[in-house]
């Protein structure tokens, strides 16, 4: 995908994320991600508005083989961490997994049924399988990342919805 098309798609994705947040309860906690070159770069477009609208905006600190949510209030609370992704700085307070209402989930590919192809580390699968995780799982992808089939293992966790540049897909195990 060319840079101009990627920027345009990221802008549309940002708009869909903000629209989804507008439909959420007044006090919600959302986790975000960003940083890898081939991922939609929506972060600068949504973070200020999400921080203003949400009761909590969180990013994940990689600790061992786990993702630990921490609250951020601006881009100043972020730094490049493991794998060059945005991570919260040490001063950012921890957020219990049970407090997360929405988790934006990256992936290399998704199916309309909510299956996700990650990068092989299992970080998001472990997070989403956490017994305290009751959050709405929303995959973030470009349209070209929506494919027909992904091999599935018992530990793989599905997303409930997928946001692309053209809108929201309600994931269904039969879809």
Predicted regions and their residues:
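N-terminal active-site beta-alpha-beta segment that forms phosphate/nucleotide-binding
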Residues: 1-98
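Conserved phosphate- and dinucleotide-binding cores of soluble alpha/beta proteins
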Residues: 65-175
């Amino acid at each position: 995908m060319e840079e101009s098309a990627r920027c345009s798609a990221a802008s549309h994705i940002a708009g869909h994320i903000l629209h989804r947040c507008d439909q959420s309860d007044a006090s919600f906690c959302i986790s975000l991600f960003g940083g890898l070159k081939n991922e939609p770069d929506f972060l600068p477009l949504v973070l200020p508005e999400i921080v203003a609208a949400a009761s909590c905006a969180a990013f994940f600190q990689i600790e061992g083989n786990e993702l630990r949510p921490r609250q951020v209030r601006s881009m100043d609370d972020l730094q490049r961490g493991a794998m060059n992704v945005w991570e919260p700085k040490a001063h950012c307070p921890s957020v219990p997994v049970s407090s997360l209402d929405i988790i934006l989930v990256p992936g290399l590919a998704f199916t309309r049924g909510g299956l996700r192809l990650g990068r092989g580390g299992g970080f998001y699968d472990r997070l989403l399988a956490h017994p305290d995780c009751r959050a709405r799982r929303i995959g973030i992808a470009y349209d070209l990342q929506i494919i027909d089939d992904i091999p599935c293992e018992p530990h793989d966790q599905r997303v409930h919805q997928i946001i692309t540049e053209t809108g929201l897909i309600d994931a269904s195990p039969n879809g």
